[in-house]
Curated annotation (Swiss-Prot):
It comes from Citrifermentans bemidjiense (strain ATCC BAA-1014 / DSM 16622 / JCM 12645 / Bem). Allows the formation of correctly charged Gln-tRNA(Gln) through the transamidation of misacylated Glu-tRNA(Gln) in organisms which lack glutaminyl-tRNA synthetase. The reaction takes place in the presence of glutamine and ATP through an activated gamma-phospho-Glu-tRNA(Gln). Heterotrimer of A, B and C subunits. The active site is at 78 (charge relay system), 153 (charge relay system), 177 (acyl-ester intermediate). It comes from the Bacteria. It holds the Pfam family Amidase. It catalyses: L-glutamyl-tRNA(Gln) + L-glutamine + ATP + H2O = L-glutaminyl-tRNA(Gln) + L-glutamate + ADP + phosphate + H(+). Belongs to the amidase family. GatA subfamily. SUPFAM superfamilies: Amidase signature (AS) enzymes. This is Glutamyl-tRNA(Gln) amidotransferase subunit A.
C-alpha cells in the first residue's frame, strides 16, 4: 500500500512510530498529484513550497513528541476557504487572482494541529452547482469514470479522495455539496449541523445554509477531521457554543436497538434501480445488526427544492453584491464611469449559472414579489424543520438515498438547469432543517459507479450518525474499493 492510499489514522500511526516522515508523505502526495491530476482536474492551485515547509514543521513537532491526530497529514481544501498567502478563487474568474490576507477559522484549526495543506480544490463557481461543471477552471472529472461528473459543488474535494491525491479534504455543503459528490466518488462526506463549524473565512453563497464539513476515506477519519474543525468561534455569529464531543470514542457503540426511520417521501418512483437495490441491502444490513427499522413521514419534502432555490438564490444575490471591481477581484479595464465598471466587471467575472442564480434571487427579493416568494419560502422552511423534529420524536436516525441516480455524464444536464437542481432532492431538506447528514459508500451501479447512503441525525446528533455509519462500514467494506487511476 502506497503512502497516498493511507487514511488519516493509518498515516498518523506511521508518523508516530517514525516509520515515515511528514516530508516523505507530503512528497508522495505531491508526486501523486503531478501523476494523475491532469486527468482529474481536482486541484485549482497546488502549493508544493508551502506544503513542504509545513511538513518540515510537522516533523519537528513529531520529534518533540507533540503529535495531534492531523499533525503531518496532507490535506486539500475546497477553494472556497480563504487561505493566507494562497490564491483563493471560489472557482470564479472574478476571484481568479485574489490572495487573501488571512486564514479562515477551519483552516487555522487545521494549521494549529500541524496539518499540511497541499492545495486548493476545484468546485462549482461560488459553490453553485451539482456537477463541478460551472467552475471557471474547467470541469473536475470523476476518478471512477472520467467521462462522468464527480458531483458538486465540492467536486474536487471528493475527486481528490477517490484519486488519492489528498489524505482528507474539507468542503462546504449548502444543499448537498459535500454528501452528493462523496456519494458519486465513493468516499465519506459529512455535513455537520448548522453552527457546528465556523463559517468565518468561507466565501459566502447562502449564509443560512452553508456549512463546513470533512470528506474522507472512512468514517473514523470523518470523526477525526470533524473533531479538529468543530467548535464555537466568536468570529462567526451563527456558530453555536456547545462542547465538541470525542466523536471517535463513540464510534464502536453499535446500532443494536437504535430506531432508524425510512422517510416514505424519499423512496419514490423514478429512483434508479441500482440506487434502490443499494438502499434495500443497507436496510437489510441494519436489521441484521439489531436496528429497529420503521417508516416515517416528512410531508413537506415535495416543496424543498423550490423553497431552497428561493432562499439560497436570494441570499446569494445579497452576498455576491460585494463583487463590483472596486476593492478586490476582477475589474473591467475599459469601463467609462463607475456604473459601467460595476456592470462590466460583474458581466465578465461571473459565469452563466452564477448570473442565473443572482437574477432568480434578486427577482424573489424585489418589491411586489418579496412576500409571494421569499417570505413564503421562509414559512415553508419552518414547516420542513418541524417535519424533521417530529420524525426525531419517533426515531434516532433517518436513512435515505443521497441522489436519485449514480454520477451522470459530463454535459448531460447542462442544457436543463431544472434537471440539475433536482439531483439534490434528497439532500436539500437536511440543509433547510439545519441538521446533520453523512454519506457513506453503499455499493456500486452496474456500470461500476459508487452509490452512497445518507444517514440524517438530530441537530448536533453527529455522534449518532457517525456511529451508525461506522457500523455499516465495518460490515460492508465498500470504502476499501479504489478508483482505477
Amino acid at each position: 500500500m502506497e503512502i497516498f492510499d493511507l487514511t488519516i489514522h493509518e498515516l498518523h500511526e506511521k508518523l508516530k512510530a517514525k516509520e515515515v516522515s511528514s516530508v516523505e508523505a507530503t512528497r508522495a502526495m505531491l508526486d501523486r498529484i503531478e501523476a494523475v491530476d491532469s486527468q482529474v482536474n481536482a486541484y485549482i492551485t497546488v502549493t508544493p513550497e508551502q506544503a513542504l515547509v509545513q511538513a518540515e514543521d510537522a516533523d519537528r513537532r513529531i520529534a518533540a513528541g507533540e503529535i495531534a491526530p492531523l499533525t503531518g497529514i496532507p490535506v486539500g481544501l475546497k477553494d472556497i476557504f480563504v487561505t493566507k498567502g494562497i490564491r483563493t478563487t471560489c472557482g470564479s474568474r472574478i476571484l481568479e487572482n485574489f490572495v487573501p490576507p488571512y486564514d479562515g477559522t477551519a483552516v487555522a484549526k487545521l494549521k494549529e494541529q500541524g496539518a499540511v495543506i497541499v492545495g486548493k480544490l476545484n468546485q462549482d463557481e461560488f459553490a453553485m452547482g451539482s456537477s463541478n461543471e460551472s467552475s471557471y477552471f474547467g470541469p473536475c472529472k470523476n476518478p471512477w469514470d472520467l467521462s462522468c461528473t464527480p458531483g458538486g459543488s465540492s467536486g474536487g474535494s471528493a475527486a481528490a479522495i477517490a484519486a488519492r491525491t489528498a489524505t482528507a479534504t474539507l468542503g462546504t455543503d449548502t444543499g448537498g455539496s459535500i454528501r452528493q459528490p462523496a456519494s458519486h466518488c465513493g468516499c465519506v462526506g459529512l455535513k455537520p449541523t448548522y453552527g457546528r463549524v465556523s463559517r468565518y473565512g468561507v466565501i459566502a453563497y447562502a449564509s443560512s445554509l452553508d456549512q463546513v464539513g470533512p470528506l474522507t476515506r472512512d468514517v473514523t477519519d470523518s470523526a477525526l477531521l470533524l473533531g479538529a474543525v468543530a467548535g464555537y468561534d466568536p468570529m462567526d455569529s451563527t456558530s453555536v457554543n456547545t462542547p465538541v464531543p470525542d466523536y471517535v470514542a463513540s464510534l464502536a457503540k453499535g446500532v443494536k436497538g437504535i430506531k432508524i426511520g425510512l422517510p416514505k417521501q424519499y423512496f419514490i418512483e423514478g429512483l434508479d434501480p441500482d440506487v434502490k437495490r443499494a438502499m434495500d441491502e443497507a436496510i437489510a444490513m441494519y436489521k441484521s445488526l439489531g436496528a429497529d427499522i420503521r417508516e416515517v413521514s416528512l410531508p413537506n419534502t415535495e416543496y424543498a427544492v423550490a423553497t431552497y432555490y428561493i432562499i439560497a438564490t436570494a441570499e446569494a444575490s445579497a452576498n455576491l453584491a460585494r463583487y463590483d471591481g472596486v476593492r478586490f477581484g476582477h475589474r473591467a479595464e475599459d469601463a467609462r464611469g463607475l456604473a459601467q465598471m460595476y456592470s462590466k466587471s460583474r458581466a465578465e467575472g461571473f459565469g452563466p449559472e452564477v448570473k442565473r442564480r443572482i437574477m432568480l434571487g434578486t427577482y424573489a427579493l424585489s418589491s411586489g414579489y418579496y412576500d409571494a416568494y421569499y417570505v413564503k419560502a421562509q414559512k415553508v422552511r419552518t414547516l420542513i424543520q418541524q417535519d424533521f423534529l417530529n420524525a426525531f420524536k419517533e426515531v434516532d436516525v433517518l436513512l435515505t438515498p443521497i441522489a436519485p441516480t449514480p454520477a451522470f455524464k459530463i454535459a448531460e444536464k447542462l442544457e436543463d438547469p431544472l434537471q440539475m437542481y433536482l439531483s439534490d432532492i434528497f439532500t436539500i431538506p437536511v440543509n433547510l432543517a439545519g441538521t446533520c447528514g453523512i454519506s457513506v459508500p453503499a455499493g456500486f451501479s452496474a456500470a461500476g459507479l459508487p452509490i452512497g447512503l445518507q444517514l440524517v441525525g438530530k441537530p448536533f446528533g453527529e455522534q449518532e450518525i457517525l456511529t451508525a455509519a461506522y457500523s455499516f462500514e465495518r460490515e460492508t467494506q465498500w470504502h476499501l474499493k479504489k478508483a482505477p487511476l
